C-alpha cells in the first residue's frame, strides 16, 4: 500500500513542477512567503506524504493573500519517534 502513496506523491510533485515551469513564469512573482507556496507544497508532500502534505499546502495557500504579512514560513519538521519519557504524561520517575 505504501507504494501507492509514493506514486501519488510523485505525481503531485510532478504537477507542481509543471506549474512552476509553465504557469508561474506567466503570472510573475506573487507569493508573500519564503519558500514560495509551490516549493512549500513540494517539500510538505515529500516529507509528510500526499494527504498531510496537501493539507499543509492548502493551509499555506489560504494564508497567501494581500492581507497577510507573509515572511519566512518553513515546512514543519517531520515527527520523530517519541522516546518513552517524552510521551508519558505522568509526573513520577521512569524506570
UniProtKB/Swiss-Prot annotation:
Query: How does this protein sit in the membrane?
Result: Peripheral membrane protein
Please provide, in alphabetical order, the Gene Ontology terms of the cellular component aspect for this entry.
Answer: plasma membrane
Origin: domain of life: Bacteria
- Which InterPro entries does this UniProt record tie to the protein? Membr_insert_effic_factor_YidD (IPR002696)
Identify the keywords attached in UniProt to this record, alphabetized.
Cell inner membrane, Cell membrane, Membrane
Query: Pfam families, alphabetically?
Result: YidD (PF01809)
What's the stated role of this polypeptide?
A: Could be involved in insertion of integral membrane proteins into the membrane.
Task: Give the similarity note.
Answer: Belongs to the UPF0161 family.
Name of the featured protein? Putative membrane protein insertion efficiency factor
